[in-house]
UniProtKB/Swiss-Prot annotation:
Pfam family membership, one: Hormone_4
Species of provenance: Ovis aries (Sheep)
Listed SMART domains: NH (SM00003)
Entry protein name: Vasopressin-neurophysin 2-copeptin
GO biological process: vasoconstriction
Lineage of origin: Eukaryota, Metazoa, Chordata, Craniata, Vertebrata
Subunit description: Interacts with vasopressin receptors V1bR/AVPR1B (Ki=85 pM), V1aR/AVPR1A (Ki=0.6 nM) and V2R/AVPR2 (Ki=4.9 nM). Interacts with oxytocin receptor (OXTR) (Ki=110 nM).
Location(s), subcellular: Secreted
Amino acid sequence: CYFQNCPRGXXXAMSDLELRQCLPCGPGGKGRCFGPSICCGDELGCFVGTAEALRCQEEIYLPSPCQSGQKPCGSGGRCAAAGICCNDESCVTEPECREGIGFPRRVXASDRSNATLLDGPSGALLLRLVQLAAAPEPAEPAQPGVY
């Protein structure tokens, strides 16, 4: 079960147990479940309500509590990917999750400039974050998709 929504019996026994990492998910199992429909990883970004996050529904039925992410952020969330904070229900952009433990900048020594490499999912995530930052606030809740 997810730490935030475990039944009283399972969460009360938390002092006796150590929290385990939630189930792996996403392409190649490189992400971790943050909620029943949220899968995030350093290299992947976050999948919300997509096929990549389907496995995360299994976590609800496991008796021991789990928690993904290392650094607390936002309102009861944890840093899920570079610049993203998630709780078990949703994700938001969060500057304090941009760099640090688990989200190092990668710089190639062979590059003539000291720019950060943005390959594949990292570049796509950055582009999406820039688009989201420039977009007006949506009038209705976000639809399932890749963020």
